[in-house]
Amino acid sequence: EQALTAHFSEYVSMQWEKLCRDAVTGNLVNGVVYGKAKRWWGSVLNEDKKPEQVEFDVMAESLEKKYLLVGECKWTTGENGKQLTAELLRKANLLPFAKNYTIVPVLFLKNAPKDDAGNAMLSENVVELMK
C-alpha cells in the first residue's frame, strides 16, 4: 500500500500521457487530423549551438503533413500555460525536421492553467476526442 501511495501520481501521469497520445492519434484536434502520436526525445543543438536533450510527451504529424503537434502532459495543478507553451515552442523550433511544419503547441492538463495561452486541453476535452 505504501509503494502504491508513493508512486501513484507517477503512475497516473504515465497513464495520462498515454491517454493523450491515444486521443490525438487519428482524431480531429482543433480542425486538423493527426497520424500516430508518439513520445519523442533526443539531442538537438540549442540556441547557443550546444547539445541539449529535449523531450516531447506528445508529437504527431498531420495527415496532410503541414502541421506538427507538440504536446506537454501535466497531471498537476497550477501550471503556467504561457510559460509551458513558450518552452514547448522553443524546443520544437530546435528540431531540424520541424522546419517544414507549422508547429501546433498543445498543453494536456488536469486543470485549467493559471496563465492560459489558449491552447490547453483538459481531461474532459481528451475524453471527448476519444468518443
Residue spans for each PLM region:
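A cross-kingdom feature that marks ATP-driven nucleic-acid transaction machinery
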Residues: 1-131
